[in-house]
């Protein structure tokens, strides 16, 4: 009886949504310009907070008679395809038949778009209906007309309501017939597993009433193929017009399964089904040799134990196999949360099922989960999250550990509650091992879940995963992942680079070169102290002793360079010069003199700043030089760091030597003032 309560609450919420969206329902849209054929509009803005805010809203607006108090004129040639979508697409009225339909709704990239079916003239109303794929997806298959006494061509057999047009009639059968909805609410044993659930009916489990109801539904709809992409969601359970019509009359033992549709995930469901049209069949869980499909629907037409038109979730498969301890279809409502937030809607349908099961379910050592992207069994989708894939890998690595625990059936015929032959398929917790739920819900032996997620398989690489995290996959505590030996994985993962990972700084703590002596002392350079200005300038009288600390980092190497033993500069490293060997501004010279004479000392620049801008022969770009200390840099980022670390508060300590920048940085030709010296240098190149 809980199912009916859930559905009543959902329909009450939808009724409130209808009251809030009266403007959307009673507004017609007219175009102010001609629309060519195959013009595309969209995407349509849908929040998926209710049934009326999903892709089913077009069918829910369909009526025989229109009351249009609002007319909305739209310039369809305006900007299209914005990130927010087109708001007026929600206001387009539903077409009543194919003759007046001029727009077709279809799914692309998980979003709803409209396509013009013909040329639409100016000042013509836009009327939309679903395309062929969405019609099959929403189970809005056209039924044959039921004529009663030569009156209306379309009559509902449940409530005897008559319709003049096809599309409102189909929408009524699918969504709005009160007797159908009431029968769904009043028939809870179709969803409970205590007795003869819908998916647990055996060979003779049905009754005369169920057979009559099935025959009545077969009379309502023609023989058409069953829905390919019907997803049994945990929220809405609505009867379709022809769910079992494709089944032959010989399968009268199976009950009348009312397929249900999760309208919030239909868009991504359709997109997934296009990519993987061929379904991967898992080991059989039903009777005989009829196996269910792991990532798609259970096959229609299976007479014994088949869930016609419904998707088998991992919980349901375990309930039939005897070992999860969940009664029938109740696993859907108890274990799977309602998809309400937008974050939950981003998951793929396969991932939505796998994430909904909070415990792993194995059968003969195979995990009932969507094929992992690491093994190549499924294509990578834009909605797949690496964490979820890592969870599937973590569950697979312990599949062998829980194989012999007794919680899973060893073969399809040995399970206690497996539906087979003509027996009823009721599954109880006593059918399997008593400790099966505890073993399935127990913590995994391979360490904590965050550890497994962090260690993960080195084969998977996310653009947002740090390299160090990927590198730890081979050694920590995550041995036995689905990749191979740990050593090779570590070597392979160390070579991989991520575009979004923060690289290790090539300059150790950004201070590779340290001045050995103070700027004012100017002591002579000893032979073992590395490179001094005497080697660079033989005529220098007072050289600046410079000590190299980790100078190999400038070369790209890893080990530090020894300062003793007559060590010289490595190849391709920047040469070092004392600031006394090139001219500086008078303000800087006065500051240097004051620093040498008094206690006030300037911040010593690092050796990277001791490069003149004129040495272009050293492959140093001239534009990356500091205008305050004449230091040149290979990269602009180094110059930016230098300016922030050395010259941020430099002039705050020397108020006596400040000069106005307008006087100091002025073009001698055109007298234009500049704030920075390199701006003046660029300006001077224009005069050449």
UniProtKB/Swiss-Prot annotation:
InterPro entries: PRDM8-like_PR/SET, SET_dom, SET_dom_sf, TR-Histone_Methyltrans, Znf_C2H2_sf, Znf_C2H2_type. Residues 209-219, 275-284 have a biased composition (Low complexity). Keywords: DNA-binding, Metal-binding, Methyltransferase, Neurogenesis, Nucleus, Repeat, S-adenosyl-L-methionine, Transcription, Transcription regulation, Transferase, Zinc, Zinc-finger. SUPFAM superfamilies: beta-beta-alpha zinc fingers (SSF57667). It is an enzyme of class 2 (transferase). Disruption phenotype: Knockout mice lacking PRDM8 shows absence of the corticospinal tract, agenesis of the corpus callosum and hippocampal commissure; they have an abnormal itching behavior that results in the formation of skin lesions, and occasionally display an unusual movement in which they walk on their forepaws. PRDM8-null mice also have a non-progressive defect in retinal responses, and loss of rod bipolar and type 2 OFF-cone bipolar cells. One of its GO terms (molecular function) is histone methyltransferase activity. Expressed in brain, heart, liver, testes, retina. Highest expression is observed in the retina and hippocampus; moderately expressed in the cortex and cerebellum. In the retina, it is expressed in bipolar and amacrine cells. One of its GO terms (cellular component) is nuclear body. Its main location: nucleus. It is found in: Nucleus. It holds the Pfam family zf-C2H2_4. Its EC number is 2.1.1.-. Residues 16-131 form the SET domain. S-adenosyl-L-methionine binds at residue 130. Gene3D superfamilies: Classic Zinc Finger, SET domain. A zinc finger (C2H2-type) spans 154-182, 624-647, 665-687. It comes from the Eukaryota. SMART domains: ZnF_C2H2. Residues 184-309, 397-506 are annotated as: Disordered. Residues 192-208, 414-424, 470-489 have a biased composition (Gly residues). Interacts with BHLHE22. Interacts with EPM2A and NHLRC1. This interaction sequesters EPM2A and NHLRC1 to the nucleus. Probable histone methyltransferase, preferentially acting on 'Lys-9' of histone H3. Histone methyltransferase activity has not been confirmed in other species. Involved in the control of steroidogenesis through transcriptional repression of steroidogenesis marker genes such as CYP17A1 and LHCGR. Forms with BHLHE22 a transcriptional repressor complex controlling genes involved in neural development and neuronal differentiation. In the retina, it is required for rod bipolar and type 2 OFF-cone bipolar cell survival. This is PR domain zinc finger protein 8.
